[in-house]
Amino acid sequence: MSGACGQMGSKKKYIDKGQIDFMDYNDIPSADGSLDDINRPKRTSLKNAYDDNLLFVFKTCHNHIHVNDGLQKQPAFFELLKVIFCKIEDERNIPNPLEFYTTSEERSNPDGQLTVKKRISKIFERVKKKHGKIFDSNDEIKLAPRSLAYIVSELQKYSLLNTNIDIKGKAYEEIVGANLRGDRGEFFTPRNVMKMVVEMINPKMDERVLDSSCGTGGFLVTAMTHVIADLEREFSAQIGRNKCDWDGDSIRAFNDRISDMASHYYFGFDINPDLVKATKMNMVMNNDGSGNILQTNSLLPPHEWTDEFRTKLADAIGVDKSEIRNHNTIAYFDVIVTNPPFGSKIPVKDKNILEQFELAHI
């Protein structure tokens, strides 16, 4: 069909194919909003995600990358995480205007899409400098400009920093599980179980916390969130105001304390290198600190740990590597929250490993 005719009473309107150009807008403005709000959001207009809508957005973006960029699910997942990191870094870049955005016009044409990619790539350079433990200096966003513009348009209206941590955690851990869990019988502890365990243990601010089978880092994030709530109450009592009324200096001091805690008091081990990276990302996404997340088989006796792992652990704790040699010399942690990797699909039958444990000894 090359055209259409509409009639109302005595008036007629003819429309030929190609006569009208349609603009694909990023979103629908709110009742009291404008197109500017959906094209270049301000910090005050960012929305908190609720229920499962963040999970839906993450899945939609991941599927878009998988289909349009031709990436398998795992590479597509890590490309999505690069963009999510850019979104978080941009939100933290106070008081500068937000740069993580695409206008509807940019998204609809190749030149605009290239402009978006250049803008987001500039943010990613800051991400790499800030998180050198996660990204290499030569890493880059590999998405096509068209795909990147679409992903940005889906994420730009949300505040990932202010969204409830349980909503972020559920969205992150489900998409990690779908892409990194593999076929080794791995499973991730339900969030309500993690919260119950952490509340029972009640970790304190200056206690070293370890998850020796950290998976995606859910236990570590839950424990640190518990401690941050205590820290917020302490700061509010000292300042005399709730967090929403703190000045810039107080917020910076609070965030610096959180980063210091993550760097010195939170440790995670996992045998899967991809999950080690995913845990670091989870820690940064929720608490602005990647912690000390190391790859190792924590079931092995300490004297069988690799020299590289022992060196990194010793440096993080602040001891000499020679001190990390057996069970009697590694009591450096105050709290251990973990779900050990024992199960019907991943049986551990090595007597050298099992004889270390009273309940697993055969």
Predicted regions and their residues:
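Nucleic-acid nuclease catalytic cores
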Residues: 1-16
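Non-catalytic C-terminal interaction segments of nucleic acid-processing enzymes
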Residues: 15-49
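Short amphipathic alpha-helical segments and their helix-coil junctions
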Residues: 52-71, 151-153
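Class I SAM-dependent transferase core
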Residues: 60, 64-65, 167-192, 198-200
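Structural motif
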Residues: 66-80, 161-166
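Long recognition/docking surfaces used for binding and targeting
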Residues: 81, 85-177
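Conserved S-adenosyl-L-methionine
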Residues: 187-320, 327-331, 335, 343
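Mobile active-site "lid"/loop adjacent to the S-adenosyl-L-methionine
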Residues: 235-239, 342-362
